């Protein structure tokens, strides 16, 4: 069977799993092993990074550098220094993926300007690790590997169990659409990386990375329409057709309730520390921690569901979607707007929009955001100096052609015009 990277179409499916007590123990063991390996490798590389800076001044460091590079480059050397990685419950592929994630983080640090030095992974209530599916030579279906559905009887039409590496058969549940896709896409489909995780509320999930040469979904029909969108904080976005999509502000709506729950959690933590009790043994603290986590998850899920609906609706109705290339990370540094920007979740919106455009055969592109607000979409005049439109002004009139503009609608029209200009140059 071909590698995932060599296949044309990619899809991710997440199912909720219900592990037994023994399987929960195995998940916890592999989460700990992955975190330990990642942190050990990070400690080695941080020390290497410091020693190499001073090696020219102190030749004595060269021996230590050679030893650290040897440990870093050899998985066997690493496993030999950490005996518990040889235990039967430890998935060797979880160790491989931890090393791969570590190497990827350091490559990003070295190659991407502005990326900070990789830090350590902290132990938390949430758990996760990654493993991979294996196939025999000549396998044609993803169910011929070590990840496959398990049917407890010959007449069972809908599978309720899935077999995962090390964990074995485990009960699962997912939406009907995801299950139909998994059961229909067997031939010429490969499962790549599998992420097993437990969230802060104690629920377990398995995410399957699927690759195939056959599309996972049918493309949406062409509409011949194109649209530019202007992102803002009052609304989610305004498009070049004049449509305004509201911003439900889920985080702000839950802010008071969440703050109250977090204050209560903080007081319980202080009481436990004062009484010299472990937080794991403080039952009231754990109950309140769970209540707080449920509130946070509710906000996150509500926001994600809304973005899923809006991005799919946009991709379904348009052949080309053009947006400003916003530097969300830089904008979050503005402490006055950071909470509102995080609440509207522009970054997730763009990621979902790009994924759905690829999945359904449409096109999404970004154009520079410079002066989209200050430019008249009618005549192209750019407001400069004292003429510049301040942030709070929602309407303005062009001093050259006299057209009266709504700020966001005008910006969306400029975004679309720039996108069409780029498309014309590509033809």
Question: Which positions does each model-derived feature cover?
Answer:
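Nucleic-acid substrate recognition interfaces
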Residues: 1-427
